[in-house]
Amino acid sequence: MSYTPGIGGDPAQLAQRISSNIQKITQCSAEIQRTLNQLGTPQDTPELRQQLQQEQQYTNQLAKETDKYIKEFGFLPTTPSEQRQRKIQKDRLVAEFTTALTNFQKVQRQAAEREKEFVARVRASSRVSGGFPEDSSKEKNFVSWESQTQPQVQVQDEEITEDDLRLIHERESSIRQLEADIMDINEIFKDLGMMIHEQGDVIDSIEANVESAEVHVQQANQQLSRAANYQRKSRKTLCIIILILVVGIVIIFFIVWGLKG
């Protein structure tokens, strides 16, 4: 499995890459769920658990990459006329990404629970008491012990073996990695929430500026219209005055000419 590194800032390509990654995350989550369903069955092997870990880490990397792409998409330059359409597109991608992440985190939690149950069984069968280190407080936030509500595994009278120790260490390492990855997904959820809030503020500011500019243009047009009307009235008044003066001069001319005659 592999994931694609960063791409250019073309909006169409970036949106396509985000959609493609979201689809991959959804498909990988379904594949992880199918693998989880095989645990505890005759198909459960170390190779299967290794495959599960690889699928989970690959999907986690896809989620981080998609988070980065969505951030880039939100800050691409755009014109005011394109801004609303860009926001609608981004909101749709964020909603789809959130749904895919929610499903992925669900199977992550299931995987962590299965690993803990496995370690608990190995410890019980090997007469090893206790759970996990006291400082592993993060695990308590994500993993619930189903064994607390189920009958305890019968303890067998045998000492712990090197194979048991190796299995316990491997599974504990896998649990720590799973819970670190779950924390990564939680951080992505926080990023998505912040991006939605910031994007909304930017859109509101741009729309307010556009509306303000439209008001100023309308006011300027009104002022120009009033000035044009005033100019037309002034010209009309001037023409009337000139006409009156001409008529007056003609009348005076005839009066003077009549007196001379």
Curated annotation (Swiss-Prot):
Protein name according to UniProt: Syntaxin-7
Gene Ontology MF term list: chloride channel inhibitor activity; protein-containing complex binding; SNAP receptor activity; SNARE binding; syntaxin binding
Positions where Phosphothreonine occurs in the chain: 4, 79
Gene Ontology BP annotations: endosome to lysosome transport; intracellular protein transport; organelle assembly; organelle localization; positive regulation of receptor localization to synapse; positive regulation of T cell mediated cytotoxicity; regulation of protein localization to plasma membrane; synaptic vesicle exocytosis
Tissue: Detected in all tissues tested. Highest expression is found in kidney followed by lung, spleen, heart and brain. Lower expression, in skeletal muscle, liver and testis.
Residues of the t-SNARE coiled-coil homology domain: 165-227
Residues carrying N-acetylserine: 2
Protein's organism: Rattus norvegicus (Rat)
Topology Cytoplasmic: residue spans: 2-238
Gene3D superfamilies found in the cross-reference section: 1.20.5.110, 1.20.58.70
Record note on quaternary structure: Interacts with VPS11, VPS16 and VPS18. Interacts with VPS33A. Forms a SNARE complex with VTI1B, STX8 and VAMP8 which functions in the homotypic fusion of late endosomes. Component of the SNARE complex composed of STX7, STX8, VAMP7 and VTI1B that is required for heterotypic fusion of late endosomes with lysosomes. Interacts with TPC1.
UniProt keyword list: Acetylation, Coiled coil, Endosome, Membrane, Phosphoprotein, Transmembrane, Transmembrane helix
Function field: May be involved in protein trafficking from the plasma membrane to the early endosome (EE) as well as in homotypic fusion of endocytic organelles. Mediates the endocytic trafficking from early endosomes to late endosomes and lysosomes.
Superkingdom field: Eukaryota
Family: Belongs to the syntaxin family.
Stored PANTHER family: SYNTAXIN, SYNTAXIN-7
CDD domains in alphabetical order: SNARE_syntaxin7
